[in-house]
Amino acid sequence: MAISHRGFTITRVPMLADNYAWLVAHGGASAFVDPADAAAAIEAVEAAGGRLDWVLLTHHHDDHIAGAVDLAARFGARIAGNAADAARLPRLDAALAPGQTIDLGGEAVRMIATPGHTVGHVTYLFGDAAAACGDTLFSLGCGRMFEGTPAQFHASLQALAALDPETLMLCGHEYTLSNARFARHVDPDNAALAARAAEAERLRAAGAPTLPVRLADELAANPFLRAASAEEFARLRAAKDKF
């Protein structure tokens, strides 16, 4: 089901076991974020009208890029990604530096660097409506730190925390239930977190998704987003890795 928010139309596209890709439309144009599966992506684009202008890649992991080339070829779309990580991405038609934008139906979509999960990870900002954050931020959690440093990852999360609180966070995986268990372990007295965890349980029991999620809700409940320092973030990330 498509969601309309601040002039953008956002469609969640489930892929693989627990991935979410995202189809975002504005002004008659559309962009597809992180197509792991070309067939599923093509089906979603065709169901939405059959136009695709951009394929946007957040990072180089195969479960986010495997369908990019075939998807772009099917619709004549351009592929955009981080110029600094181009060697690990499919061929880029638009190799972007942090802060650069693409046009989506008259609205600028800005790429920002959000290293931590990988050193080349980026996030795409669709105006003040949505942020396609890949595996940097998850609902009630964050991605594993495969390549970056705690300082890098914490800075990336703080950059996301500074966005408009009504921004919809377009995360790359359905990990909310497992994240909620850890979050409640480290922050047991957080009422907002308890309510979010209960809601996630209800939604998943009904087979419903927990994403997208408002940034404001994450600011109130996500321990990684609330970490006051890189050192606190590092302790949380290490604890989650062993949880």
UniProtKB/Swiss-Prot annotation:
UniProt entry keywords in alphabetical sequence: Hydrolase, Metal-binding, Zinc
> According to its UniProt record, in which pathway does this protein act?
Secondary metabolite metabolism; methylglyoxal degradation; (R)-lactate from methylglyoxal: step 2/2
GO biological process terms, alphabetically, are:
methylglyoxal catabolic process to D-lactate via S-lactoyl-glutathione
Reactions mediated catalytically: an S-(2-hydroxyacyl)glutathione + H2O = a 2-hydroxy carboxylate + glutathione + H(+)
Q: Indicate which residues the UniProt annotation says bind Zn(2+) 2.
A: 63-64, 135, 173
Tell me one GO molecular function of this protein.
Answer: hydroxyacylglutathione hydrolase activity
Tell me which InterPro entries the record gives.
Answer: Clx_II_MBL, Glyoxalase_II_hydrolase, HAGH_C, Hydroxyacylglutathione_Hdrlase, Metallo-B-lactamas, RibonucZ/Hydroxyglut_hydro
Subunit details for this protein?
A: Monomer.
| HAMAP family per record | Glyoxalase_2
Its biological purpose:
Thiolesterase that catalyzes the hydrolysis of S-D-lactoyl-glutathione to form glutathione and D-lactic acid.
> What family does the entry list?
Belongs to the metallo-beta-lactamase superfamily. Glyoxalase II family.
Q: What is this protein called?
A: Hydroxyacylglutathione hydrolase
